[in-house]
């Protein structure tokens, strides 16, 4: 189990809670976003600080644009009085649901929010803008740079230097000028190291287009995340012949792919409590153990002949069970009436008729970006599912029990960031586009206010979804260019732990199936005596009662070093299965 918050300053965590409460009561006040962003940066979460700063910038920009869709305004009533009024109002309703203000309900769909009197708010003024805009740019640039998103940090430096600041904002100009020089110098130095000693200083020119776009965020269970399940919970039946149980796995964080060079025995002995699939009875070779379909799917092909729900191919014209088109959408088709009804119940209800969503993340030209945008589309589908089902996205059954390869929170994460060296937990890919801008756009296209929706769709929720999807989503490659084009999250498939000697094979279509491997399909490794012993122990069965059902996340034909490198992203460290340990000992 990952430690939660005992390595973070409890006073700062408390300040973060209070700042968030104030923000949720005053969502269109850019000063509230700025205040919380500073706390996030102090806590060692520059990714969250960057998002707060960008939201503050967006709202402050509306002060200069009277036509802005999201005008900046601030609550007149002090927080204490407002909270007291809300409490009195809730106590006066005998049938009020105690969970109505909990994070399980989307603020974006809460009609009570829209009924708030305009007399409780006043416009953010031009004076407010001049007083704070410099601090906004300072926080935004510093946070993006700490994450490693250098191109966006540079762009906002240039943008910020074009503005006129008030008395407070004058302090921002020297910082932005210094940041530009640091970014330029770092770029030139990196290129010089790559080019070798024969290149002269003047031969390398700064090119903003060559700056790094993708950085990293900490991949942790946030201290305020109350949605992670108890991984020591009772056994759960999920199919006729298998069930979910807890299992102690070796902790892989901190080990290198070439694990034989790891000299610290404690790294190999540390245990991580996870969930796994186990056989409830003996299973014969070739037996299908599990059929699992999922509505948590995504495709990056625009106008493709795939079912919008399950991503299976649409039936041929004239088939006995024809495809079904949504009457309220321009180009949303389902493979069957059953899929259409299930989609409406699980996700389509929240996005039906919202045509602006159709092009987001589709037909991406750069092959390197295709997988990243598929993960974005999975986040968008999770948003739609949560909004349709009126639950928090992290409480969706398809999401809740997935392990996100979370790391332990470091003792002093801020010290690592301050030294421009990301802490060990900063392994989650993070970019301004995919973690900040596009999720806000998705909420807008869904008809939600991205500021009023923070209780349910804040950036820490987005990051947690990304952490759960990366390494667990299954996919299919395009027959056109070989890049990923379809992916899906099958939570039970994800629960089956990895081994380089798996006892099941899996097939991906509109659903995933687990089939028990026969002897000819089992990986042959170890001495002939050991192989024969393992075969005899199985006693003619593929999987014996109480044995763990083991999946695989990499090409089993690779050598141990290559397998470990391939599966590092999904496992969080080098594989320590019996086969890998034995092959490592032989090499």
Per-range role (PLM):
Residues 1-587:
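Short alpha-helical interaction motifs and adjacent low-complexity tails used for partner binding
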